[in-house]
C-alpha cells in the first residue's frame, strides 16, 4: 500500500509516520483524553492504494472531528491537522501569495485574470517586508475545525480551483483592501481580526483587495415606479446587486393591486403576485458571486395593500404553483393603526396604491389622517375585519416561519434618517433601517464584535492571555473587559467608515445613497458564549444587565469615533436636520437615561461641535457564517441546542456545545451514557438527573427560556441600537394565542423589528438512529393529554387569538 506525496513521489504507508505527525500536532492537549494513536488507527483503516498525503490529512482531520464528543481536545486536533495540511499546500510568504494571485492567468482562455486589484498589489509590494513580518501563522491553529472548513470552502481565494491563501493571508488582504497605504491602520486591523476580537462581514472577507471590492452586505431597494419600465429597472438593479453578493430588501407598496385600471393600455393589472414570480426566478438565477450563495430578496408590503392576502400565501407549500414564489422572503411593514384595529377588533380597509396614493410615503399621525380620509371617501377596494387578516398572517407564520414583522412607525420615529423622508423597508435580515427612494438604494457595510473574547481572566495580562476560554466552571475568576470593547468598537467604526469610500458599488443609486448618508452597521456575536463564560444563565438579572452595558458601550464609542471622524473630515452630507444634529440620540427616543459608565455629557458636547460622520451606527445582524468561522454562537441569540449533527464527506457525526462538554469533562461526568441521554433529549439537559442544577440553568436552550425575556432583552438593548436587530422568535408549539400576545408585546415594547423568523419545532420527534437505547433507562410515560394532539379548528384558533388580545397578561404568563 503506498501514498502519493505532495511532490508526486510514491511512498509506502507507515503507521508510525502518521502517528508521529498526529502526536506532533497534539502539543498542549490532554494526553489522558485525546489519543492521537487512536486517530491514526482509524485513519489507517481508511487508507487505499494511491491516496495522497493531502487526502490522508483530510481523513485524519474528519476522524478527529468525529471524536469531538469524546473530548473537546479532539476538535483542536482536527483543526490543527486541517490547517497544517493547508500550510503544506500553500506558500508561507504573504507577498509571494499575492503575486501569484495578481499574475493569475485563466487556464482556459489564456487571458490574465488578476484576483488582486492593481493599487492593492502595488501597496503590498512596496511594503512587502513589513507586512510579511507582521503575520503570525500560528494564529491559524486557533480556528476550530468547522470554522476553518467554512473559510476554506468559501472565503480563501482559489487559483484554478485550488486554495492558495491561508487564513492569515486573507485577513491581511482584507486589512490592506480597507486601509490601502495607511500601513499602521492595516497592521492594527490585521492583529485585531487575527486575534479574533472582531470580524468584517462575509462580502468584505470575500472581496476586499480584489479588482471589484464589493464589501457591502445589505442593499435596500425601492420600487422605481409602478410601470413596466420601473419594475424591470428595479429587477435589473436587484440582479446586478445579487451578482455582487448583496442581500436585498425591496419594498413593493406602490405597485397597483389586482384588477386596477391601467390607463396606458386600457387594461387591468395582474397585481403583485406575477411580478414577484419574476423576481423569484431572478433570485434563483443570479447567485451571490459565482455560486457562493443563492440570491436572496426580502419583499416588504404594508397590510393596507389590496393584494395582501395573496402575498401571505406566496411561500406556502400547498396551492397552485402559479400563485407561489417560494424562493423569496416576505415581510410586513406594519403601521400602528393596523395593530390598533386588530386590538380593538375594528375593520380594516384594503386599498390600491394607484387609487389611494401616498400611504407608503407617510407615517404616524400623517398616515392615519390620509388612511381615514381614503376610508371616508370610499376608496377601499375591500373592507375586512382586521382580526381576520391577522388570522391569515398567523396562519402563514405557523406554516412557513414568515412573514417577518416590522413596525413602520417605530422604524421611522426612532430613526436618525427621519429627516430624509419616510423609510419604506428594512433589508433581507431585518436589522437595517434606512431611507430609500427611486434615486437612492440604501447600503450597509457590516462588522461584528466577538464578545466572548472580551471575557478575561483576572490578573492575566492581555499579551499572555489564552486566545480562547471555555466552560463556566472558572467564571468567578473572570470579568468582562469594557475598556477593550470601547477600543475595538472605535476601530471597527473607523474601518466601516473607510469601506464606504473604497467600496465598489454595483449600481450608481447605491453609491449616491452611501456617500450622502454614510450609515454603518456594528453587530455582535457570541453573547450567549460570553454569558456562559461568566457563569450567567441567559435570562438571569446579571445577564440582562451585562446585555445593556455591552450595547451602551458599543453605541457610545461608535458615536464617539464617528464624531472624532467628523472633526477631521466633516459630518455626513445630510446631517443638518437629523435628530442627532438637534441633540437627540437613540436613548432619548426611547425615553431611557443611560448609566454613568461613560460620560454622555462630554459626548453630546463633542457632537454639537463636530457633528457625526455616519448617520447610523449599530445594527446587530444574524452573523450566520462569520460566527461559525470564529466558533461563537450566533449574534445575541441563546443556544438552540446543546447537541447537533454535522455532515462531512466521511459521514455524519455529533457535536456537543463546547462549553458544556468542557464543564462536564472537568467534573468527570461526561460518559457515552450521558451523551446518549443528551441526544435523546434533543440537546436539552433539563431532564438529565446527573447534571447539577446550576449547570442546567446556565445551559438552558432557547426553547426553555421565556420568549418574553428574550423580547425584554431586545428592548433593553434597543435604546442603544440606532438601526434594528435580527430578532428571531422561538416557539416550541406555536398557537394563535401565544403568537398574538407575543407580537403585541414586541409592538408595545417599542421594538422596530418585532420578529425576524418564527422558529418552531415539530410536535413529533424524529427517529434518533444515533441513540444507543440500551444505555437509556426506561422513561416515564408521557401524560395522556399530550398523546392526543388534536387538530385545532379555525374557531378555536380565533378564540385563542381574541383571548390573548383581551387578556394579554394572562396569555403571556402561559409561556410565550
UniProtKB/Swiss-Prot annotation:
Site, Important for electron transfer: residue positions: 756-757
ATP-binding among keywords: yes
Important for hydrogen atom transfer, annotated site positions: 218, 444
Tissue: Highly expressed in actively growing tissues such as young leaves, shoot apices, inflorescences and carpels. Very low expression in cotyledons, adult and cauline leaves and senescent leaves.
The ATP-cone domain, residue ranges: 1-92
Residues that coordinate or bind ATP: 5-6, 11-17, 53, 57
Triggers of expression: Basal expression regulated by ATR/RAD3. Can be induced by another pathway when dNTPs levels are low.
Single annotated GO MF: ATP binding
InterPro entries named in the record: ATP-cone_dom (IPR005144), NrdE_NrdA_C (IPR013346), RNR_lg_C (IPR000788), RNR_lsu_N (IPR013509), RNR_R1-su_N (IPR008926), Rrm1 (IPR039718)
Similarity-based family: Belongs to the ribonucleoside diphosphate reductase large chain family.
Record-linked Pfam families: ATP-cone, Ribonuc_red_lgC, Ribonuc_red_lgN
Name used for this protein in its record: Ribonucleoside-diphosphate reductase large subunit
Binding, GDP: 202, 217, 427, 431, 623-626
Misc: Two distinct regulatory sites have been defined: one controls substrate specificity and the other regulates the overall catalytic activity. A substrate-binding catalytic site, located on R1, is formed only in the presence of the second subunit R2.
PTM description: Contains a disulfide bonds. Binding of the substrate occurs primarily when the active-site cysteines are reduced.
Gene Ontology BP term (one): deoxyribonucleotide biosynthetic process
Entry keywords, A to Z: Allosteric enzyme, ATP-binding, Cytoplasm, Deoxyribonucleotide synthesis, Disulfide bond, Nucleotide-binding, Oxidoreductase
Disulfide bonds: 218-444
Effect of disrupting the coding gene: Lethal when homozygous. RNAi-mediated knockdown causes severe developmental defects in seedlings failing to develop beyond the four-leaf stage.
Cross-referenced NCBIfam families: NrdE_NrdA (TIGR02506)
Name of the gene: RNR1
Presence of the UniProt keyword ATP-binding in the record: yes
Subunit structure of this chain's protein: Heterotetramer of two large/R1 and two small/R2 subunits. A radical transfer pathway may occur between 'Tyr-125' of protein R2 and R1.
Lineage: Eukaryota, Viridiplantae, Streptophyta, Embryophyta, Tracheophyta
Compartment(s): Cytoplasm
